[in-house]
């Protein structure tokens, strides 16, 4: 059972199956990419992680950078830089660094960013980490470099959650933003669907079928403890957090058809928000917390609507096509990613909410469950392409796509977590 199949069952529509594995792969060419070289870190050959490669892959996935071959010679953060040589190679920026194993088994990771055009030191950082956090150190370095060169916060040290199924086993995976280092937050022989990050990044809400019906839990990641949030009569599904973390929207059938309700994050009696005779589901909040976007078939086919959280009339948002689902709002509230059905395929699209203009971000496969990166510059989604499951990211123009690393089996319903609360 997946979120799409649950929605399809409610709306009387066919569901899709997905099987495969996925690998790291970046495709496409973007405009105005900054050419950057990342030299092999001195000492990284003696570590279990190729730090420079992880860092460069992060920058490439963002769509903002073009990789320049740094050759095989290692340069550390104290190396004397021949800027003319790097300019001749076409690199406007250069990253150098080192990694040293300490006596206690931890690693000292250092890096420095250089402006090859101006011949200037742009600063750097140092981290002391256990071997298990070497990839995180590379992601943090990529965050620093991304922010220095773009003026925007990087998302490489954030996390994603998604659902995987291998045989009869379901897992709720939490992974790095590149899909690596996946850890199982929950394993179950019964379906798990609809993972949703709390705004503070400490918990995940999700739907479990272990009670032989869909119920909603909130799972604290650090302790592994979880609490039952919604087990009302009928179906309990599609949790979505309000931006302040105090309230969640849910889809409940306690009063008949699937409708949107609001519930305190601590539990209690839910308040019904939608009041239609149709099927209303898949709610998400606007970033300011004032609006709810949701899917409804009240017009005859599944379309996306919005309404005030305080209640009132619903306004239709999507008009093109007869099947539009899975709304996800950008952090600035200006754009909405969603899935549309075109010629039997489910494809990712992006709408400018100001103008209503729609951009197709994928041209094939069976896409589902878009979720924005916390800086709003990338979208993660699940896709089935060529008979294989893939966890994908795309830039907002659709030009740069990356197939992320991760676990095999069926891959579904990714949700991109918030910025880490600690540095």
Residue ranges with predicted function:
Residues 25-85, 95, 99-100:
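Short beta-strand->alpha-helix linker/helix-N-cap micro-motif
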